[in-house]
Amino acid sequence: MLASLQLRSYAPTCIMTIKAVFFDAAGTLMKPNRSVGESYAIFAADCGVKVTPSELSERFRLCFGEAPRLAFPGASDESIGGLEREWWKNLVARVFEPWGRFENFDKFFVELFDYFAEPGAWSLYPEVLDTLTELKGRRLPLSVISNFDSRLIKILHGLGVGSCFDQIFVSSRVGYAKPDPQIFHAALNHHNLIPAHVLHVGDSEINDRHGANSAGLRGVLVDRHSPADPNDRHRITNLEPILDLLE
């Protein structure tokens, strides 16, 4: 278990040469082909439960924000798969609380959970493959740090980018979730790097940019929904400007 890792002490440094790049996954590298609310509504309708996608999207945002972190410190590797599934089952049950837990909820949940495990449920953002290929061509170590679960490994390989990464760190297996500095330190320890030499790129201001900065890395926010800010080089609208940040 990575949760038991011993964190190194890092001395402050003014050397800012980038020697590795870490990425978040969902919202940064990939996106669901349908909104969460739409997928939930489709699978629920198959079980006779009619709820609009917009209602489910709003409930999901609320419940996900209130849920405990998807991390299981001290859990054995053998138990994590079951813990992940139970975590998501509890979350989905909370999402549907206003409409009651329907009779065939267990069947519904299995189908929903398995659907989101398939690469076909996801797509890469247009610039991702070219950007990762360019970074690998520069021989930079790349890793993923995500508050996801074990399904992410299959998804990234199915989307054709799994081999771009030296390691894929998911919070459920590391035992810590972003913005906790310890999940960033797990990746730093794996690569034997100090924080100031690493960019971390993600779509969450709190989990990615602030979390990485708090751990001593250089956090970069990817905000695909707002125009670029020429005064903030560490907020980008897609992954292409990462290449300029390496100069």
Residue ranges and their predicted role:
Residues T17-P126:
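N-terminal helical cap/lid subdomain that shapes the substrate entry/recognition surface
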Residues L2-V21, K31, A45, S54, ...:
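Asp-based, Mg2+/Mn2+-dependent phosphohydrolase catalytic module
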